[in-house]
Amino acid sequence: MATVIARASESQHWYTQEGKPQYTVTAKNGVQRNTTLRDARTMNLVPSVTTILNAAAKPGLEAWKLNQMMLACMTLPRAPEESEESYIERVKHDSKEHARQAAERGTTIHGALESFYEGIMLAEFLDYQMGVSKAVDAHFGAKNWLTERSFAKDGFGGKCDLYTQDGEGVVIDFKTKEFRQEDKVEGYDEHLMQLSAYRVGLDVPKARCANVFVSVTDPGLVKIVEWTQEDLERGWQMFDALKTYWQVKNNHKVI
């Protein structure tokens, strides 16, 4: 297994066998473009954990998307003489815009949290940074935390938000979410599979794993969902089965 420091987003989904992100390649015209499955086959790249997880249904995400679509319908009146097709496309665009804004907000907060653990405090995001720091320290104690490390192992790759090798290790993934103190926050199987794969990929197979939920409704509010070792064993079995499905479906297996 190879592990390297990586600060870019994991959105392009591909890694070299040395653990380096390969999010783009140089096109024939000299311009950088997104890496494709065809490129991955040629370059022997491995898919990211999230790419593999995308092969499974995500009921929670689909329910959220449906809610966004319904909200768009409620707030966008149909114009006089507007065709049904045009109205539907406008509603789709509006609902996707909300999703895009939420994704951008999440990426920005992730970046601020990464900066904090690299020793950089940002006034604009101080509530988020201090909220996470206090919650993580209270839950896990003082650790030698490492940020945004990428890896490749056994046919998959990824990039972890925060982890430590202290003891048997701790692996953390940040999730931004709209919630308040009175709201119940819980993890889903996709979160469990992601963390179980990360701890295997990072060579800390017995690590404690947790999702750290960061409220975008109440900056500074943080809730931690730690998974049991029994859960994580089940998560790894699910991920490993899904990885095999992905490899067969896409006819791409790196040995």
Region annotations inferred by a language model:
Residues I255:
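Acidic, carboxylate-rich catalytic segments that either coordinate divalent cations
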Residues W145-N251:
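Mg2+/Mn2+-dependent nuclease catalytic core
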Residues M1-G157:
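Metal-dependent nuclease catalytic cores that hydrolyze phosphodiester bonds in DNA/RNA
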